[in-house]
Each structure stands twice: as structure tokens, then as C-alpha cells.
A protein has these predicted regions:
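Residue-level recognition of short, solvent-exposed, well-ordered loop/turn junctions
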Residues: 123-124, 169
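Active-site-proximal beta-strands of protease catalytic cores
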Residues: 125-134
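Disulfide-stabilized, aromatic/cysteine-rich ligand-recognition loop
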Residues: 21, 47-64, 70-71, 75, ...
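Short aromatic-cysteine micro-motif
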Residues: 1-123
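Surface-exposed, flexible loop/turn segments at secondary-structure boundaries
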Residues: 80, 136-137
Length: 179
């Protein structure tokens, strides 16, 4: 369905921010995920539902429940690649580390660093590595990008981990497409 939609409408939407968690409702939030007292980025969530691949996949799919025209999904690996290619075509440095842009605060507010933004998409150089739907080998899922502790990584970096891993440096980014 996603591929048909992309072909028909000539694209898809990517969340500007990494996924966060509303402390009270446990709902996924994206914009300024930790600015308000009731929201937190996944590093602070201490909640397996949002720190592992399975939990984030399930939560992000519920972001547009009730909307019969739009579907939300965890970002696919090919969508992440498309985002990186789009940025590279617009002269953005994405293929090697740029430590001047790194967001090295694991508890930092999502989207607060003016340097860690490319084409209005935040936190690609730091904060969290991002889970994707992409499979890697038989038992793993791909995670992309850098995190607050990995100054040698870069936005196009591809790694893998078990989907049940609960590393606090992992988050994800949602995509939206039209039905």
C-alpha cells in the first residue's frame, strides 16, 4: 500500500522529530518531544514499549488511528535512504561524521539544537539511532544514524540489533502516506 501511495502521490512524509512518549497517556509524540513536563524522549521513557523495535513499531502505527485517509508507519529503510539521497542532492553533508553538529545530550530536548538539523528534519546527527522496518540478516532489524554517544557515526550509518533490544539510545521516526 505504501509503495502504491508513493507512486500515485509522488512521495511520503517523514516526521521532523524522533518519536517520544507522553508520560501520562503513553501515546507517541513527535514535536518537541521533551519540552513539556508530560512528554519525554525515549531515553527517559524507561518503557520497553518504546525502547525496543516491537514497541515503537506498534505505537507509531497507532499515530493516525481514526484517520481513514492517512497511514502512519515506522520509517522503512528505503525511505531513510530516499531522505538521505534527497539531502545529498541539496548539498547536505550526510556521508561522514560532522562532530560540530552532534547532539551529545542523551536527555536533550528533541529538535533544540540549531546545528543538528538538515532540511528541517531534526536530530539526524545525534540524540538517538533510529529503528527502521528494514530487516538485517535473519533475526535483526536495521537502525540508522548516530546517537549522543557515537561521535564517529553519521546520518547514513547502518547498523543492526535484535528487535527486542532495549537500548535507551534507540528511537525511530514515523512516516506518513496517503491511502
Amino acid at each position: 500500500k505504501m509503495i502504491s501511495s508513493v507512486m500515485k502521490y509522488k512521495g511520503f512524509y517523514i516526521a521532523r522529530y524522533e518519536a517520544g512518549l507522553d508520560k501520562t497517556s503513553k501515546a507517541i509524540v513527535f514535536k518537541n518531544a521533551s519540552i513539556e513536563k508530560n512528554n519525554t524522549i525515549t531515553t527517559n521513557a524507561n518503557n520497553n514499549e518504546t525502547m525496543n523495535w516491537y514497541g515503537l513499531y506498534k505505537k507509531i502505527k497507532t499515530f493516525t488511528v481514526g484517520n481513514d485517509k492517512i497511514v502512519s508507519s515506522m520509517i522503512w529503510g528505503c525511505q531513510y535512504d530516499a531522505m538521505m539521497n534527497w539531502m545529498a542532492k541539496n548539498d547536505k553533508l550526510i556521508g561522514k561524521p560532522d562532530n560540530s553538529k552532534i547532539n551529545s545530550d542523551p536527555n536533550g530536548i528533541t529538535g533544540i539544537s540549531p546545528d543538528d538539523v538538515l532540511n528541517n528534519i531534526f536530530d539526524l546527527y545525534g540524540c538517538h539511532r533510529e529503528w527502521t522496518i528494514e530487516a538485517n540478516l535473519t533475526n535483526y532489524r536495521s537502525r540508522r544514524g548516530s546517537d549522543y554517544g557515537q561521535l564517529s557515526l553519521y546520518p547514513t550509518f547502518r547498523g543492526q540489533d535484535s528487535p527486542s533490544s532495549t537500548d535507551p539510545a534507540y528511537s525511530s521516526r514515523a512516516t506518513l502516506y496517503i491511502k
